[in-house]
Amino acid sequence: MRISLKWLRELVDFQLSPEELGEALTLAGFEVEEIEDRRTWADGVVLGRILAAEPHPNADKLQVCQVDLGSDRPATIVCGAANARPGILVAVATPGTHLPALSLTIAKADKRGVISEGMICSLAELGLEKSSEGIHEFPPDLDLEAHPLGSDVRPLLGLDDVVLDLTSTANRADALSMVGIAREVAALTRNPLRLPPVQPLQAKPIPNFQLRIADAKACPAYSGVLIEGVKVGPSPDWLKHRLAAAGMRSINNVVDITNLILLEWGQPLHAFDWDRLLQVMGKKKPTIEVRLAQPGETLKTLDGQTRTLQADSHLIVAGSQPVALAGVMGGEETEVGSTTTRIFLEAALFDPAVTRRSARSQGLRTEASTRYERGVNFATLDQARDRAVQLILELAGGAVAGLTTFDQRPPLERTLKLRLSRLIDVLGDEVQAADVEEILSALGFQLSRCEGANSQSALSPATETATVASCVWQVVVPPYRLRDIEREIDLIEEFARLYGYDRFSETLPTEPQVGSLSARETFTRQIREVLRGIGLTEVYHISLCPAEEDGSLVRIANPLSPEYSAVRNALLPGLVEAFRFNWDQGNGPLQAFEIGRVFAHALPPNPHPYREAEHIGGILGGDPNPHDWQHRNRPMDWFEAKGLLVSALERLGFGPEFRLDPPEEQSSLLHPGRQASLWIEGSRIGLFGQLHPRLCQEKGLPDQVYGFELQLDPLLESLERRGIVQFVPFSPFPAADRDIAFFAPLDLAVGEIEKVIRRAGGELLQSVQLFDEYRGQGVPAGQRSLAFRLVYRAPDRTLTDAEVEALQNQVRAQLATQFPVTLRS
């Protein structure tokens, strides 16, 4: 935002130099990137009148001019401009003048045998234009009593000004206006603010006119003023100078006024040619509609480009024809021109997110869209509109013929509680109640002490603690700060930045503070270490993803693009894509893991609509040794992949149990016959399995790729229940092992059999291991032969054969009772 100090001084008095003001604004949170002293551009350039212009005796394209500079004799100046002629008023750089635009210091010089005593300047030579056709001519009716010959031309060119180029944070939309910055300067200097006088508009409705707003959230307020009898022409110099200081070019008086209001109030306006609007509407009833674009619609904007409108383009429509990209740019077909006599002045509020999407859909970013995207002040819409109408009637003539309005603005009120004790906790003991009230009041906040609060600002030592605790204000937030002042800490920041961060004492901790990690963070770090230890690489993926048509994913309210319109509900899809990318790039199989958050719709009776959780995901597979010198193609099998996962969990202190899920609970990403859920202490913690062959074929992946996804919370809860791990000494007594074999149905899971064996064997059963599976000759159809090795051991004695056989018989009996198995041993 470019701030003209000359304009700023009309809104607030201050005695600071440009450098001092720039430093004060920077410390207050508005970084001043550049101070542009336009006064240096024409220091030494004066007003002159050409008395005579004769051809140069030694050069065909030069003229020798006699220029009256208000002194005793005219100055002789050699000039090459084609428009140099007697009688015109010009800008003359006298000897000794330095022109920064040319990096040139003017001196008397011999020009082909004629001594030239200065230079007649064009606007380009004064830094006001990129290029000029000839020397600049002042209006012939210029008041020479107010500006005599030989006087400084800088006031005539708007070069008696200093411009601050400053940036503000994205939450300070109010800082994109002269009034907004003037409020800050008034608060910094404790001087009163002088807002431009505005006469409230009173007008009858526009006859036979209809206004339709398709979505009140996208356009909560819309106002249109019909003004007739307007004479479009050049703007006065003061208006041109203000626009030039802001980096804008003058177009005509009506358009310049809308740009002036944008700079002054931060409220974008747009003026339509009313007769052209009626022509676009045809014979239909005059109607303005605000809606989203429909398929196939186009609009030729003011920059001359014909744009194909997207579904998220927000439009102003006349009848059925788009005439403007709402909040971004107007249309060429209805622009105000030299023949315009009736205008329709639009003043509206558009939703920031809707405007952002609309602008991005067309690759446009304008001064108007920048302000709408940050959020325009809801409270000053009428003031800005009425100020524009007032200036149009003053500078372009005409009369107001009608007004149309739509207004569904939300309530413009917010009250926050501010505690002096909290201010002191955050900022330090230097904070005094009187300073808080003075600074926040200067910023436009209304403060009132809560009932029962101490009304004394000064704190005596005897009552300091009680007074601080009881000093509480109710703070009414001004409408122009509703977008960024939402909490108590925001008020504390407002006080701190104007009080001055340099005024707070530097307080160091009196005692060393020992840092510590939470149990969750400690456990997460252990997981990372263990997974890296089994050869997996940690990866990170963005949690945003495209939305699914079935609505299974949680959608984002204001997505940046359709590709990022929802949040993920699992880590495995992202890991599959990472595996595919590495495989396609020739990097071989990816062995990786990720720890991240996933999001899902909550199920009843959860009162919250959404839930989020932290998951651990992993992917591994393919040939782990693709460059083996023996050229063996041996991809990782199920048991290797499962063994890596089990070893990682065992190193973390967990003994996982694998169970076969029913088909309706299985993951569609995994092979239906080669996936299992993981359980710990009766809680389901995740799943493991081989990727579905169809998925591998679609992605071009090797056949044997495995994935797992675990929930972090059940693992952490298991650790918390376990408490401190107690050391259990190893038994010094020998073990006794027994084998058991039997025929079992093919659909009977080994995990279920193992559970029954462990339960029947009791505490003396140390381990159970499947060591053989056989299908073929000698095995009944539909069955398989399974053989388990059971190891028994007691911590305090050597088990006798009788004890072991008794336990083994219990196992046989339980297997025969629980399952349709045929014992073989």
From Swiss-Prot:
* Entry keyword annotation includes Chaperone: no
Which GO molecular-function terms appear in the entry? ATP binding; magnesium ion binding; phenylalanine-tRNA ligase activity; tRNA binding
The reaction(s) annotated as catalysed by this protein in its Swiss-Prot or TrEMBL entry are: tRNA(Phe) + L-phenylalanine + ATP = L-phenylalanyl-tRNA(Phe) + AMP + diphosphate + H(+)
Pfam families linked to this entry: B3_4 (PF03483), B5 (PF03484), FDX-ACB (PF03147), tRNA_bind (PF01588), tRNA_synthFbeta (PF17759)
Which note does the record give on the cofactor?
A: Binds 2 magnesium ions per tetramer.
Subcellular localization is given as: Cytoplasm
The alphabetized list of GO BP terms reads: phenylalanyl-tRNA aminoacylation
Q: Which residues form the tRNA-binding domain?
A: 39-154
Q: Where does Mg(2+) bind?
A: 484, 490, 493-494
Q: Name any cofactors this protein relies on.
A: Mg(2+)
The FDX-ACB domain sits at: 731-824
Q: Which UniProt keywords apply?
A: Aminoacyl-tRNA synthetase, ATP-binding, Cytoplasm, Ligase, Magnesium, Metal-binding, Nucleotide-binding, Protein biosynthesis, RNA-binding, tRNA-binding
Q: If you read the UniProt record, what top EC class would you report for this enzyme, in one word?
A: ligase
Q: How does it assemble?
A: Tetramer of two alpha and two beta subunits.
Query: What name does the UniProt record give this protein?
Result: Phenylalanine--tRNA ligase beta subunit
Task: Give the classification, highest ranks.
Answer: Bacteria, Bacillati, Cyanobacteriota, Cyanophyceae, Synechococcales
